[in-house]
Design a protein with these regions (language model features):
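Catalytic grooves of carbohydrate-active enzymes
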Residues: 1-97
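A residue-identity detector for tryptophan
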Residues: 37-40, 66, 100, 128, ...
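Short, isolated positions within intrinsically disordered regulatory regions of eukaryotic proteins
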Residues: 41-44, 70, 132, 144, ...
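A broad, low-specificity signal marking well-ordered, structured residues that form hydrophobic/aromatic
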Residues: 54-56, 89, 127-129, 136, ...
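Short, solvent-exposed loop/turn segments at secondary-structure junctions
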Residues: 60-64, 136, 143-144
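Surface beta-strand/loop "capping" patches
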Residues: 101-140
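Acidic-aromatic substrate-binding/catalytic surfaces of carbohydrate-active enzymes
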Residues: 138-201
């Protein structure tokens, strides 16, 4: 729900104990607080191909003060207002979005998020595909293709908190990984499925 960077957020955990944040949250100066990043993100979300729908949330998820979020919100709100006035996007509460979703989809539909340009100019592009059964991520970098994520969604898999309450200040919810480039990578080697061609050599 953060409005995560579809190209760079995923690898932002590699080699560290905690995953950093590259998202639309206005407190993050290199993303939600950066005009260049916000304009790129909005183009990716609102102009590039998707399936059933594309969406993002705006605002600040955690309790930061106005001083931390002022710059980012002053960048984002006028850009959203301009797209809203042109009829390019809807701006609504999460409650209304949930109602719209229920009215239009009896089950979770396939969706896709695409980022076909790279604001860092490192020749990366990505497609995230999601369905009620699985999610997968394709990453193109230069002339290579890597499947860096496939997670299966299985309602039969009970969470650790289904039969008993959590007793710590941290909860971990998981899905079934087929490929987990975030958790399985090191700083030296990014994990993923790569398409290879065998030559006579």
């Amino acid at each position: 729900m953060l409005g995560s960077d579809p190209i760079y957020q995923y690898d932002n955990c590699v080699g560290g104990a905690l995953q950093g944040v590259i998202s639309l949250e206005p407190v993050y100066g290199d993303s939600g607080g950066s005009r260049q990043w916000v304009e790129w993100f909005f183009r990716s979300m609102f102009e590039e191909p998707c399936l059933a729908f594309a969406y993002t949330q705006a605002g600040q998820e955690n309790s930061f003060t106005w001083g931390s979020m002022e710059k980012g919100l002053n960048i984002q709100i006028p850009l959203m207002a301009n797209r809203f006035r042109k009829g390019e996007i809807r701006v609504e509460t999460l409650t209304r979005s949930g109602e719209w979703f229920r009215e239009n989809f009896p089950v979770t539909p396939p969706t896709a998020v695409t980022a076909l340009t790279d604001y860092r100019e490192k020749d990366r592009k990505t497609v995230w595909y999601n369905s009620r059964y699985y999610r997968t991520n394709l990453l193109w970098e230069g002339g290579t293709l890597c499947i860096r994520d496939i997670h299966m969604f299985d309602q039969r898999m009970e969470s650790d908190y289904y039969r008993k309450a959590g007793t710590t200040n941290q909860c971990v919810y998981t899905t079934l990984p087929v490929v987990d480039g975030c958790m399985w990578s090191t700083r030296e080697q990014l994990a993923g499925l790569r398409v290879m061609r065998r030559t006579a050599d």
